């Protein structure tokens, strides 16, 4: 399943031990900002690549060339990413990525509790009449602490859903402490039954 794969890829790659420390207040600001950017870019535009691109250009985000993307820490971007923008705010870098089936916003440092709280508020606020369904609330401690919170927006009776996922960590040994992702998938409420 895509959700489990995103959590696994988030936790597998390391950038080495990071010695830089960020004050708690700044981590909270960065937690609020990463969710706000995700809401404005990915969620508000349904992950549509054309709309997300227009949004990034309107914000004068710096579009990265392939060489710059390749120099990002492992795990900062998904394999197969087609476009990446860097947004800098208050000394922090946020990366907006578009892949064929997803839209993501990530940052190296953010307060985990702030990200999760803001993410849950976004999920409820942004549903616009769709059903909000919890898909995952997982935690792992080994090899590093990682938490995953995933919800789906699904209009009543729809055969597809929009899945919003927040992968977070408190570990300074991971290159990304907050990774927010939007994907679309077919909704499977029950096994398909064959009739004879």
Name each model-derived stretch:
Residues 18-20:
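Bacterial signal peptide processing site
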Residues 142-196:
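Glycine-rich, aromatic-bearing surface loops/beta-hairpins
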Residues 81-149:
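Long, charged/polar, surface-exposed segments that mediate recognition or autoinhibition
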Residues 36, 40-89:
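N-terminal secretory signal peptides
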Residues 22-51, 95-117:
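Terminal, regulation- and interaction-focused segments at domain boundaries
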Residues 14-16:
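C-terminal motif of bacterial Sec signal peptides marking the signal peptidase cleavage site
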Residues 1-7:
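Bacterial N-terminal signal peptides that target proteins for export
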